[in-house]
């Protein structure tokens, strides 16, 4: 399972996933979407919560996860929702690390 894997160091010369590889890994995730922003493929999901405080707490858990994995997403915190977007900045694309971290985000919700 993806959430049991660890991120590997991703340098500027790492190879981005192909569209086929992205689609295959996406099948292992729930409600994540492949998007493109500024010509960069990204992986995004919106999590919904009952209030701001719960959304804030979840954002903090993602921040801790990001530090543990040394891989950092974009996190948009709003009242009752958190939008998480993963991509590998160094390669301007998607790497397996992005899918691993997406799966770990889902595991954080399940552990609450």
UniProtKB/Swiss-Prot annotation:
Organism expressing this protein natively: Vibrio parahaemolyticus serotype O3:K6 (strain RIMD 2210633)
PANTHER family xrefs: PTERIN-4-ALPHA-CARBINOLAMINE DEHYDRATASE-RELATED
SUPFAM superfamilies in the record: PCD-like
Record InterPro entries: PCD_sf, Pterin-4-alpha-carb_dehyd, Pterin_deHydtase
Alphabetically ordered keywords of this record: Lyase
Protein name: Putative pterin-4-alpha-carbinolamine dehydratase
Entry's family note: Belongs to the pterin-4-alpha-carbinolamine dehydratase family.
The keyword Thylakoid is assigned to this record: no
Coiled coil: none
Any one GO biological process: tetrahydrobiopterin biosynthetic process
Taxonomy, superkingdom: Bacteria
Molecular function as annotated in GO: 4-alpha-hydroxytetrahydrobiopterin dehydratase activity
Reaction catalyzed: (4aS,6R)-4a-hydroxy-L-erythro-5,6,7,8-tetrahydrobiopterin = (6R)-L-erythro-6,7-dihydrobiopterin + H2O
Any Pfam family: Pterin_4a
Its EC number(s): 4.2.1.96
CDD domains: PCD_DCoH_subfamily_a
């Amino acid at each position: 399972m993806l959430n049991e894997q660890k991120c590997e160091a991703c340098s500027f010369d790492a190879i981005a996933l192909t569209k086929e590889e992205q689609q295959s890994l996406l099948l292992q995730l729930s409600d994540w979407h492949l998007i493109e922003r500024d010509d960069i493929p990204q992986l995004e999901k919106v999590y919904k919560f009952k209030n701001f405080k719960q959304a804030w707490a979840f954002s903090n858990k993602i921040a801790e996860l990001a530090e543990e994995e040394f891989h950092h997403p974009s996190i948009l915190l709003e009242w009752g929702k958190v939008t998480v977007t993963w991509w590998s900045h160094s390669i301007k694309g998607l790497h397996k690390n992005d899918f691993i971290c997406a799966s770990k985000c889902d595991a954080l919700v399940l552990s609450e």
